[in-house]
Amino acid sequence: LSLSDTFLAVPIAIDRNGLGHGSEGSLKNLNFLRSYEWSGDLKEQRAILAMAHEIYRYGFVEICENDHGKCSSIKIFLSHAKAGDTGRLHAESIYQFIDSTNMSRFFDATEISPGFKFDEEIIKHIKESTLVAIGSDAYSSRYWCQREILCAKQHQRPIIAVDCLHDFEDRVFPAGSNVPCVHVSPDTPISQSDILRILIATILETIRHLHAKKSLEYYQSQNWIDNDCAIISRPPEIRQVIDLKNSGKQKICYPEPSLYSEEAGWLSHLEVDAFTPLWNKAEDGAFSSFRIGISISDNPVGNYSEHHLHADHLKRLSQDLARHLLARAGTVIYGGDLRKDGFTQFILDEAIALKTRLNTDNIHVENHLAWPLYVSDS
């Protein structure tokens, strides 16, 4: 196994003996994840958290040879209301857990250097962090909570909302929407399982956010997206669109999936064209004169570790192919039976969903019955 700048490895020690592999060879001097230290009930969550964090570090951070890991770790900004106990106590528990791992953190005034302005320091940290908004009953009504959300949105930072309402909030802050949300119990102390769920969602959203941005920027560099098009990593929001339009942008590209026409209708009033790479109105009729056949075989029998091909891969491929061919007015031809969870059913489901999404009847699927006929054993 030869490692390089483009082929990296994160070794995992199943037991203490596994650490011995770090004394020589390609794994020499590499730090191992120690799975034997993870408690039994939470082992799966800890594994996901640890591996997702390494994917973030090696995928989106420039790591120097002498980097000890801490400076390339994800930075998390815990945003919470001080009023009431739920938000504050949940934030303290998350803070304590983060402090025991290799994730840098920023936690209210505890990280603000003496002599620095409070608001300037908060904004500075938000600009380089993933914001975790701990939504207690008082959260949406607090001035600084609103400012922290708006600052994160302004600087296109990843955001996770944590729903821990005890009773209710009288008004949900509009800018706090359009982001992933994790629900946890308002009871204190928050469980380690819920902390792990929050942190896993935080890291996965950070990876998604950064990957989407880099992917769209690459598409733009290849002229698949116009150079005068703004790139954003979430579906567009009215405050953001107004700012972009004021800066001269009339076109906006955001990641898949595209918004339903009813949700995106307000964009037409601002005369802004917002689209995803595969859902551009300019290509709506690109395949109107084509009848396109799809032929997909079953995946090899066996487990994932042997063939490195999960059964879901082919299902998703058939869905994606059908979705984008149909969206461009193509007629999809497929030969198959309508067995439960079969590829034909998946393609028909996509056609039905697409009719609703595009609000049109111009969706065509031709299914030619396969021979021999499929007969269920049951």
Residue spans for each PLM region:
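C-terminal interaction surface of TIR/SEFIR-family domains
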Residues: 4-7, 11-100, 165-289
